[in-house]
């Protein structure tokens, strides 16, 4: 279906039968029918206008919380490139960042500008677009604490803006329709001393390194924390620490992380996650909800 789309009006790179494994931290999964990297917001709008409404659409950022199944994705995948990675320091301690901007870089630029309130982004391995979609958070703060407004494009190619209230944020969720692709966020910070903020970020970095598997093929937090409980504690209590299926393993360091070893498949990872869910439910009666986004064909 995607090969029949008239893409003469778009300027960005279009790749058919594009491998998606390189764009996922797990480094597993199949191909997308089409991968589009828009040149800018106008180019993204032009692509969306010619994309048939019945073609499934997926937007990817760093791929830090993404599991692409082995059969690949039957539809169009959009990856926001350099034009969406800008980070601008504005008056009154505000930051304007493209949806493709890496959370860690936003945190650092804000710190260097003496803007406090963004240190939590140091603990999120993703992009601003993902943080908008999921109300990304870490270390007792989340996106709704700093967002002023977000800008996006809907499936018809129409630019839309949302204030923080209209985002409908709750825990790891935004109520904005899935067909809206976020392109930019305007965020509000507060005055701070660069040295103090950078020290706070350094403490977050040390805490992550000590308690989470970094520099490994993982997908970040696998499951959302249920109310009044921590997912990792429930998983540990169910005896899942180190549990392995095929090339996938529950991290020994932090049980809410799944690790892909050499030879792992997406099926291994998903099967392991489901086995963890089964054991946790059997032990505690709590049904864990996936935080990692699983897409594509088995």
Set out the residue ranges of the language-model regions.
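Structural signature of FAD isoalloxazine-binding scaffolds in flavoprotein oxidoreductases
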Residues: 29, 36-41, 67-85, 133-163, ...
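Anion-binding (especially nucleotide phosphate/pyrophosphate-binding) glycine-rich loop
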Residues: 2-128
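Short, well-ordered alpha-helical segments in soluble proteins
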Residues: 110, 128, 132-136, 151-154, ...
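A generic local secondary-structure boundary/capping motif
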Residues: 66, 107-110, 118-122, 135-142, ...
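Short beta-strand or tight-loop elements
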Residues: 116, 146, 165-167
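Residue-level signal for pocket-adjacent positions within structured domains
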Residues: 15, 21-23, 30, 61-62, ...
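Phosphate/pyrophosphate- and phosphate-bearing ligand-binding catalytic cores of soluble enzymes
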Residues: 15-16, 66, 153-274, 278-298
């Amino acid at each position: 279906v995607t090969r029949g789309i008239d893409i003469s009006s778009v300027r960005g790179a279009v790749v058919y039968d594009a491998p998606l494994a390189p764009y996922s931290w797990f480094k597993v999964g199949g191909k997308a029918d089409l991968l589009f990297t828009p040149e800018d917001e106008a180019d993204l709008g032009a692509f969306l206008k010619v994309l048939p409404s019945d073609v499934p659409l997926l937007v990817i950022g760093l791929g830090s919380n993404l599991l692409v199944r082995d059969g690949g994705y039957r539809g169009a995948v959009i990856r926001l490139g350099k034009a969406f990675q800008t980070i601008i320091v504005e008056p009154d301690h505000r930051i304007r960042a493209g949806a493709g901007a890496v959370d860690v870089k936003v945190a650092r630029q804000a710190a260097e500008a003496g803007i406090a309130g963004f240190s939590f982004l140091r603990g999120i391995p993703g992009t601003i677009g993902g943080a908008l979609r999921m109300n990304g958070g870490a270390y007792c703060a989340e996106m709704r604490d700093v967002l002023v407004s977000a800008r996006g494009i809907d499936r018809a190619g129409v630019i839309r803006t949302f204030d923080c209230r209209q985002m409908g944020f709750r825990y790891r969720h935004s109520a904005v329709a899935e067909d809206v692709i976020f392109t930019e966020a305007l965020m509000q910070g507060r005055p701070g001393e660069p040295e103090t903020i950078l020290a706070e970020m350094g403490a977050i970095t040390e805490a992550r390194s000590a308690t989470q598997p970094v520099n490994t093929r993982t997908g970040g937090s696998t499951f959302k924390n249920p109310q009044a409980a921590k997912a990792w504690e429930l998983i540990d209590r169910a005896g899942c620490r180190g549990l392995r299926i095929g090339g996938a393993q529950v991290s020994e360091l932090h049980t809410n992380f799944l690790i892909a070893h050499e030879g792992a498949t997406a099926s291994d990872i998903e099967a392991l996650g489901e086995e963890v869910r089964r054991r946790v439910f059997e032990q505690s009666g709590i049904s864990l909800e996936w935080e990692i986004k699983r897409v594509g064909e088995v």
